[in-house]
């Protein structure tokens, strides 16, 4: 959810404030990404860009990030399982699935891309039931890909049992 990017941004701003130096957006992104690379190895820069953006960002690999305006009257609730996950582990699991069942896994990955595109439209047009359905379907696919966790699945089940329109896992 960008916690380390937010911390890197705050620390960078604090240092520049302490030394009474002006900080350009370019410098802020440079130093915050530098910190992220130390923390994560090879960070994408997405989290730093997101925490420093006035609007949500839409990201597709190898395309420029796009700021999007939300028209959203619902609530998003974020829960933490306490389980530490690593993107690199999830990637390894999916790579293994591709080796084992290439056609099926690639279809699931493609479907996740289509669901993500739909979610963008639903967020921008306040289509909450449709967004919930997309989240549920995406979580099911991610579970079948092997990147979920029993605690996550229990939280999703609890959220849905208590009136949530949708629920899915996200990164840490």
Residue ranges and their predicted role:
Residues 2-6, 43, 106:
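Short, conserved micro-motifs enriched in small and acidic residues
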Residues 2-21:
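DPxDG-like acidic metal-binding loop motif
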Residues 18-23, 30-42, 48-169:
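C-terminal nucleotide
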């Amino acid at each position: 959810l960008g916690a380390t990017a937010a911390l890197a941004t705050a620390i960078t701003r604090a240092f520049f404030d302490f030394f009474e130096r002006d900080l350009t957006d370019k410098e802020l992104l440079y130093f915050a990404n530098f910190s992220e690379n130390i923390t994560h190895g090879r960070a994408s820069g997405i989290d730093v860009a997101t925490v420093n953006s006035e609007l949500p960002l839409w990201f597709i690999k190898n395309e420029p990030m796009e700021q999007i305006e939300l028209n959203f009257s619902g609530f998003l609730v974020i829960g933490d399982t306490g389980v530490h996950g690593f993107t690199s582990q999830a990637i390894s699991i999916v790579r293994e699935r591709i080796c084992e069942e290439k056609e099926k896994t690639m279809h699931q990955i493609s479907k996740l891309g289509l669901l993500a595109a739909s979610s963008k439209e639903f967020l921008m047009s306040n289509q909450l039931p449709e967004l919930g359905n997309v989240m549920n379907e995406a979580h099911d696919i991610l579970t079948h890909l092997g990147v979920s966790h029993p605690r996550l699945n229990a939280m999703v089940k609890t959220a849905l049992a208590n009136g949530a329109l949708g629920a899915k896992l996200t990164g840490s």
